């Protein structure tokens, strides 16, 4: 962990920014008021998709924190507007794939991270041609795969949260 060195690596700083942007998109900041919620994301067994796993798990932690603020009377209602999930996709050996494992991610020709809300709207989209450039059609195909994956993750989040925020 970077905290042991008291310094963030560039990769950790980028992940931190992505997670922060993604989670802020879920919240009505005015309703939250003058509060800070710290979400610490440790991916204990990262096998590719660390950034998006941090977003998806971080959202559950955020929802639980907001629920506690409501239960303890600090907020009248939850400031969360939307569920947020993130998933990665890529092109490996010319084949579009969802949720790449490390062995696939390390040889991906194209890598894409997609964060969405439960309405299917894109919050963050990061795509990189690792071994080659990619076409708009390929990007759209990867985004469709990510939308499917995000819908599956949304079901898991709702189940973990008892179906409510």
What spans do the regions from the language model cover?
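Polyanion-binding surfaces on beta-sheet-dominated domains and ring/shell assemblies
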Residues: 1-165
């Amino acid at each position: 962990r970077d905290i042991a060195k008291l310094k963030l690596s560039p990769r950790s700083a980028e992940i931190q920014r992505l997670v922060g942007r993604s989670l802020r998109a879920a919240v009505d900041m005015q309703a939250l008021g003058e509060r800070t919620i710290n979400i610490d994301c440790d991916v204990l067994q990262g096998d590719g998709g660390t950034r998006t796993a941090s977003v998806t798990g971080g959202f559950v932690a955020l929802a639980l924190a907001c629920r506690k603020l409501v239960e303890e009377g600090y907020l009248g209602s939850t400031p969360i507007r939307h569920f947020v999930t993130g998933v990665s996709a890529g092109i490996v050996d010319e084949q579009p794939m969802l949720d790449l494992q490390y062995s696939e991610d390390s040889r991906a020709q194209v890598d894409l991270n997609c964060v969405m809300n439960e309405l299917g709207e894109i919050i963050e989209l990061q795509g990189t041609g690792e071994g080659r450039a990619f076409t708009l059609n390929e990007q759209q195909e990867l985004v469709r795969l990510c939308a499917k994956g995000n819908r599956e993750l949304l079901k898991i989040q709702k189940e973990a949260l008892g179906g409510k925020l």
